[in-house]
Amino acid sequence: VTSDGAYPTFNYYVAGFGGTLLKTPYAGDHEDPNALLDLADKQKAKLVYLANPDNPMGTWHEADVIESMIAKVPEGCLLILDEAYVEFVPEGTAPKVDINDAKVIRMRTFSKGYGMAGARVGYALGAADLIGQFEKIRNHFGMNRAAQAGALAALGDQGWLAHVRQQVAQGRATIGQIAKENGLSTLPSATNFVAIDCGRDGHFAKAVLDELVANGLFVRMPF
């Protein structure tokens, strides 16, 4: 179970392994935890995917919302909590980690806040028995030693992470101001990108896109 329009990589793996993908709509600009859980419970789903903060919206849920969602995960189901952008959430809003909770596995990366996308360093936080199951199917293309050393060094330099957070916040504010000056609005973001609401329909959004391209600004089409 996932949200209709959410980050698509989860979908590819479900399809690749012959699974059935079920989707539920967003609630405004946010993924809808209750709707995801209701659908999972109704369909007896094995996996539920939620990104917090969300890609592509950039919005996020407060810690209490996510912690409540984890507590309500149906029996026999696992919540895949994508926290790729967790380093950018407002102070105090990241949900606490209970490493012994077998209802959730948290996916994180050094590609965003730590700026190490080329090193391909990702990791999961989960209960020991759950993580142990992955050892049975883990392939031999593991993370290289240089990437591991870089990740450990990055963890030791929290001053740099704070600098990156500050720079990203400035960038979001700049993009928001540019949008405002052109009669557009931005969605609140806890990521290193900003979603711009063009405020009308798809035709107008396409016109904005075309004008950006005409002015030498490349915009990657979503998914």
Residues covered by each model-derived region:
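Active-site pre-lysine segment of PLP-dependent enzymes
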Residues: 15, 31-43, 56-79, 83-116
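Short beta-strands and strand-loop turn motifs
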Residues: 22-24, 47-53, 79-83, 188-190, ...
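PLP-dependent aminotransferase-like
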Residues: 1-50
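PLP-dependent aminotransferase class I/II
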Residues: 103-180, 184-187
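Residue-level recognition of strand-loop junctions within catalytic nucleotide-signaling folds
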Residues: 89, 127, 156, 199-200
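Conserved PLP-binding catalytic core of the aspartate aminotransferase-like
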Residues: 26, 169, 179-215
